[in-house]
């Protein structure tokens, strides 16, 4: 898991503070100065609040939400924006000018402008995928006229270009947020995106394409070789091992909603008692364990390390549930199964209607209630998938833009303890002066009339204390009497 933290508006979160004023004298009434505290209600301005939790699922930045969802409100009508006359969508994409690109998209782009190509027949999306311009690809996703399956003069699409170049983030973004993407589109030589990634040894792109449903058994028309055979032919050992591993275990079971983080049952060999082996077998096992180096053994399938990886990468893991959100926990990715884009999944749920969504939620709640208290506690803070009720009321007739799937985090937290959006208010106090001495509260002489609890007094302790005081008084009286008897007679006469 890779976290890419963005820089804050003040340079990595550094905050310049003025030196604190001198501390007031003791005993003086001190009033709270509003300048001594800073209250934060919008956490988007703080540093380290923008992150990409994974390459294939992440929320957009705040400015992307404003441009993608509230574009009509952010740009007033009748106010022209400063855009050069020669600026086009293709030039802005080639120059990686994200600000100009978003401005052009908000103002409206025709089909001819969106499909403008260079001398090699490449559109702005293909150029951005070739150079690895992630922000440009995200900005082009807002344009409704961009053809994701456009082929250049050599027949390469945006997906083939990104997979061949090894841009894993762009490849995952194309697979997740561009509806209608053709995974099996071939170029002029008959190669698919998976074949090109296998030839170049792009393991991250191979994993993303195979889990998205790319055809592993497809063959090119000239040599008739599959992607795995092309990886073997070009000497990509890591790619061959990865593809073989994915074919052996095509579906990650920890991404299922029904997955339980339980230890696997022990194998049959471990269940047999030690006394079932004879002397020769035990001697052979002892010699083999001594002569075999333990460092050579790798992680075993179904072992402790494998179980730890499954638990930490599951949907209900604390490391994943607090930063990631999935829209289809009931259908995890699998090799050979076509995975739909986020917009297509949300459109299918919206077409079912709010009543079907409520039935799914009720059924999921009943299923969660049967899992036990431990599973309920582990899932209490995990984000759940599903369309919010506000989106379900729109109906299938409402046009779903591409950025509509990237919902704000507060709109997806529908199972919170408090209803609605609860924004905490953080109050940060400044550090006092080095010479400041806190004033200690004066102790009260008696606590009889106070509202606090008092220490209980036991009767035997009170009697013991009274007896001790009486003995001390008797000793003092006897000492005074003895002192008077020792006084000289001539002093008494006077």
Swiss-Prot record:
<feature type="compositionally biased region" description="Basic and acidic residues">
    <location>
        <begin position="371"/>
        <end position="382"/>
    </location>
</feature>
<feature type="repeat" description="ANK 3">
    <location>
        <begin position="154"/>
        <end position="183"/>
    </location>
</feature>
<feature type="modified residue" description="Phosphoserine">
    <location>
        <position position="405"/>
    </location>
</feature>
<dbReference type="Pfam" id="PF00023">
    <property type="entry name" value="Ank"/>
</dbReference>
<dbReference type="InterPro" id="IPR002110">
    <property type="entry name" value="Ankyrin_rpt"/>
</dbReference>
<feature type="compositionally biased region" description="Acidic residues">
    <location>
        <begin position="30"/>
        <end position="42"/>
    </location>
</feature>
<keyword id="KW-0677">Repeat</keyword>
<feature type="repeat" description="ANK 1">
    <location>
        <begin position="84"/>
        <end position="113"/>
    </location>
</feature>
<feature type="repeat" description="ANK 5">
    <location>
        <begin position="223"/>
        <end position="255"/>
    </location>
</feature>
<feature type="repeat" description="ANK 2">
    <location>
        <begin position="120"/>
        <end position="150"/>
    </location>
</feature>
<keyword id="KW-0040">ANK repeat</keyword>
<feature type="compositionally biased region" description="Basic and acidic residues">
    <location>
        <begin position="440"/>
        <end position="451"/>
    </location>
</feature>
<feature type="region of interest" description="Disordered">
    <location>
        <begin position="1"/>
        <end position="80"/>
    </location>
</feature>
<keyword id="KW-0175">Coiled coil</keyword>
<feature type="region of interest" description="Disordered">
    <location>
        <begin position="349"/>
        <end position="494"/>
    </location>
</feature>
<dbReference type="InterPro" id="IPR036770">
    <property type="entry name" value="Ankyrin_rpt-contain_sf"/>
</dbReference>
<dbReference type="Pfam" id="PF12796">
    <property type="entry name" value="Ank_2"/>
</dbReference>
<protein>
    <recommendedName>
        <fullName>Ankyrin repeat domain-containing protein 33B</fullName>
    </recommendedName>
</protein>
<keyword id="KW-0597">Phosphoprotein</keyword>
<feature type="coiled-coil region">
    <location>
        <begin position="459"/>
        <end position="488"/>
    </location>
</feature>
<feature type="compositionally biased region" description="Basic and acidic residues">
    <location>
        <begin position="459"/>
        <end position="487"/>
    </location>
</feature>
<feature type="repeat" description="ANK 4">
    <location>
        <begin position="189"/>
        <end position="218"/>
    </location>
</feature>
């Amino acid at each position: 898991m890779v976290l890419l933290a963005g820089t804050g508006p003040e340079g990595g979160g550094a905050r310049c503070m003025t030196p604190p004023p001198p501390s007031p004298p003791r005993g003086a009434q001190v009033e709270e100065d509003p300048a001594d505290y800073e209250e934060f209600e919008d956490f988007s301005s703080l540093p380290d609040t923008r992150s990409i939790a994974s390459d294939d699922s992440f929320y957009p930045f705040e400015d992307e939400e404003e441009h993608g969802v509230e574009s009509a409100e952010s740009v007033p009508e009748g106010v022209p924006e400063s855009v050069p006359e020669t600026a086009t969508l293709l030039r802005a994409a080639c120059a990686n000018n994200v600000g100009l690109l978003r401005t052009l998209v908000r103002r409206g782009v025709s089909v001819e402008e969106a499909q403008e190509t260079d001398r090699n027949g490449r559109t702005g999306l293909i150029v951005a995928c070739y150079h690895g311009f992630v922000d440009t690809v995200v900005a082009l996703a807002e344009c409704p006229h961009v053809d994701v399956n456009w082929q250049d003069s050599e027949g390469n699409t945006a997906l083939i270009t990104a997979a061949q170049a090894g841009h894993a983030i762009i490849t995952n973004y194309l697979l997740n947020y561009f509806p209608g993407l053709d995974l099996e589109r071939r170029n002029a030589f008959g190669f698919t995106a998976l074949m090109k990634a296998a030839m170049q040894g792009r393991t991250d792109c191979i994993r993303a394409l195979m889990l998205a449903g790319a055809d592993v058994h497809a063959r090119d028309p000239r040599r008739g070789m599959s992607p795995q055979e092309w990886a073997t032919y070009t000497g990509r050992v890591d790619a061959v091992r990865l593809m073989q591993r994915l074919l052996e275990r095509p579906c990650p079971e920890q991404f299922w909603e029904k997955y339980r983080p339980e230890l696997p049952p022990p194998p049959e060999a471990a269940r047999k008692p030690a006394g079932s082996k004879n002397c020769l077998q035990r001697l052979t096992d002892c010699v083999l364990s001594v002569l075999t180096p333990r460092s050579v053994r790798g992680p075993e399938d179904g072992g402790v390390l494998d179980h730890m990886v499954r638990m930490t990468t599951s949907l209900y893991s604390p490391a994943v549930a607090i930063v990631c959100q999935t829209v289809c926990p009931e259908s995890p990715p699998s090799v050979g199964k076509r995975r739909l884009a986020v917009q297509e999944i949300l459109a299918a749920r919206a077409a079912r209607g709010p009543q079907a969504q409520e039935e799914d939620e009720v059924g999921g709640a009943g299923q969660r209630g049967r899992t036990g208290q431990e599973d309920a506690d582990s899932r209490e803070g995990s984000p759940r998938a599903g369309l919010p009720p506000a989106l379900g009321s729109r109906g299938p007739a409402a046009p779903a833009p591409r950025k509509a799937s990237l919902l704000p985090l507060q709109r997806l937290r529908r199972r919170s303890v408090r209803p609605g959006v609860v924004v905490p208010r953080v109050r940060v106090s400044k550090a006092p002066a080095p010479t400041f001495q806190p004033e200690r509260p004066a102790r009260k002489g008696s606590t009889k009339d106070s509202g606090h609890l008092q220490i209980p007094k036991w009767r035997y302790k009170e009697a013991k204390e009274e007896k001790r005081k009486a003995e001390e008084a008797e000793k003092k009286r006897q000492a005074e009497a003895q002192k008077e008897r020792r006084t000289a007679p001539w002093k008494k006469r006077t």
